[in-house]
């Protein structure tokens, strides 16, 4: 299965999560939604600092969707300083089959 990665980035309260959930609903069953806030705040209870535990988990969960899900949506503030290299790796991992916003 060919997987498409959709990355939604932006400021706090800009509508990323709302749009991501709407996209997941639109694409339907098997669409993986990876939310930075859920992983960082709810699952790990860590602050968004350089090197925090959520970085690696976001990366691994997102990679998990390749070949298993038609669409993988990664959403969050995902600042370039903290997550830029990870995002570039994911884009490469998904064979450039990526949309970024």
Outline where the language-model segments fall.
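Conserved glycine(s) of the Walker
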Residues: 15
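The conserved Walker
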Residues: 11-12
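Conserved beta-strand scaffold positions in the cores of enzyme catalytic domains, especially
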Residues: 31-33, 96-101
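Glycine-rich phosphate-binding loop used to anchor ATP phosphates in small-molecule kinases
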Residues: 50-97
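Conserved substrate/cofactor phosphate-moiety recognition/catalytic segment
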Residues: 18-70
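Basic/polar N-terminal segments that are highly enriched at the extreme N-terminus
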Residues: 1-2
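Walker A (P-loop) ATP-phosphate-binding motif of ABC ATPase nucleotide-binding domains
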Residues: 5
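Hydrophobic anchor at the beta1->P-loop junction of P-loop NTPases
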Residues: 8
């Amino acid at each position: 299965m060919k997987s498409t990665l959709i990355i939604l980035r932006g400021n706090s309260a800009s509508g990323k999560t709302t749009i991501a959930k709407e996209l997941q609903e639109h694409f339907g069953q098997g669409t993986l939604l990876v939310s930075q806030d859920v992983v960082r705040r709810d699952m790990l209870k860590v602050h968004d600092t350089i090197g925090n535990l959520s970085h690696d988990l976001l990366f691994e969960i997102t990679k998990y969707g390749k070949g298993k899900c038609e669409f993988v949506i990664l959403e969050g503030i995902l600042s370039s300083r903290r997550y830029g290299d990870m995002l570039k790796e994911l884009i490469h991992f998904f064979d450039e089959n990526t949309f970024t916003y």
